[in-house]
């Protein structure tokens, strides 16, 4: 007979890497073209004037300028704009 009980195993021990999502540049900040404004899953924020969208829904500036956020339309979509400097 065994003198000690078996140690057993655990089903824990896994965790995914952080994805660093969220707003990176806030309203009023001055940014350069190509700067990431928002990293997101899906379109919580929609691209507005002078803002591009990547295949992972990242919003980025197309021109140098100042960031502004707005709520538009009957569906209250949150949009991000960059006014050229």
UniProtKB/Swiss-Prot annotation:
The record's section on PROSITE patterns has: RIBOSOMAL_L27
Q: Check the record and name the InterPro entries matching this protein.
A: Ribosomal_bL27 (IPR001684), Ribosomal_bL27_CS (IPR018261)
Q: Name one GO biological process term.
A: translation
Pfam families reported for this sequence: Ribosomal_L27
Report which superkingdom the organism of origin falls in.
Answer: Bacteria
Annotated stretches, region: Disordered: 1-21
Q: Which keywords fit this entry according to its UniProt record?
A: Ribonucleoprotein, Ribosomal protein
Compositionally biased residues, Gly residues: 1-10
Among its keywords, does the record have S-adenosyl-L-methionine?
no
What GO MF terms are annotated?
structural constituent of ribosome
Which family does this protein fall into?
Answer: Belongs to the bacterial ribosomal protein bL27 family.
- List the PANTHER family hit by this protein, alphabetically: LARGE RIBOSOMAL SUBUNIT PROTEIN BL27M, RIBOSOMAL PROTEIN L27
**What name goes with this protein?**
Large ribosomal subunit protein bL27
Q: Which organism is it from?
A: Polaromonas naphthalenivorans (strain CJ2)
